[in-house]
Structures are given as C-alpha cells and as structure tokens.
C-alpha cells in the first residue's frame, strides 16, 4: 500500500507541481487548498506525512502543525512546513515540525526529504 501524504497549499500551481511530483514517486496524495479541506480529510483518513504551507486563506500552517503535535493520535505524523518568506527560524520556534523548506525549492531535494521521512 502506498504511503499517503496530505499537501496543504493555497497556490494551485505549487499544489499541482507538488502533487504531480509525489504521485510520480508512487505516493497517494490528498491535495487541500485550505485548512478546512485538510481537517475534513483528516476525519476520513490519517496520512503518513503532512506538507503544510504557512500562510493559508483560512488560517495558518503553524496552528495546524501545533494541533497535530498536541494530539496523541497525530503527533507522530511527520510535518514539513513550506514558506515563500524567509522567516523559517521564527516558525521553527513556534512549531514542532520535523522539517522546514523555503519556496521556491529544488524538486529533487524536496523529494529526497519526503522519502527520508517515509522510509521509517
């Protein structure tokens, strides 16, 4: 069974590129454009990994990450935070995500990071 990754990204172009890349790597991908869609999917199935944009139209990835890490059922799910802004050090202080990546990012590096988290 393929590993399942939830991608939460409001920019449709970036979301589609990430989804395409991950599907090519044989992952099952649930792409969400906002936090409401993400939480709806979480009620259906827990993923093996979550990739979160920090700025979303109806909330932010930091709050989602915090909620995931505080919940016994979801705290072990690896979270990668993405941002187009260079304030990831500030985000690291507020959020217990396993990884942080700046946009734009190298697709090969991104794919390798995802593979490392899902190899365990």
Where do the language-model regions lie?
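Active-site residues of response regulator receiver
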Residues: 53
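Alpha4 helix (beta4-alpha4-beta5 surface) of REC/receiver domains from two-component response regulators
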Residues: 63, 85-102, 108, 112-115
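Hydrophobic/aromatic residues positioned on beta-strands within the core alpha/beta folds
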Residues: 80-82
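Acidic, metal-coordinating helix/loop segments flanking the phosphotransfer/catalytic sites
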Residues: 31-49
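Two-component/phosphorelay signaling modules centered on CheY-like receiver
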Residues: 12-30, 117
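The feature encodes the CheY-like receiver
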Residues: 57, 75, 103
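Acidic catalytic/metal-coordinating carboxylates
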Residues: 34, 60-63
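Conserved acidic carboxylate
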Residues: 9
């Amino acid at each position: 069974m393929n590993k399942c990754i939830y991608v939460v990204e409001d920019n449709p172009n970036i979301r589609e590129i990430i989804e395409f890349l991950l599907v090519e790597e044989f992952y099952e991908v649930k792409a969400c454009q906002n936090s409401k869609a993400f939480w709806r999917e979480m009620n259906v199935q827990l993923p093996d990994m979550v990739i979160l944009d920090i700025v979303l139209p109806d909330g932010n990835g930091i709050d989602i990450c915090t909620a995931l890490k505080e919940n016994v059922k979801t705290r072990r799910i690896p979270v990668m935070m993405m941002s187009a802004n260079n304030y990831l050090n500030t985000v690291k202080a507020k959020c217990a995500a396993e990884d942080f990546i700046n946009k734009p990012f190298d697709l090969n590096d991104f794919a390798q990071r995802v593979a490392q988290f899902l190899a365990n």
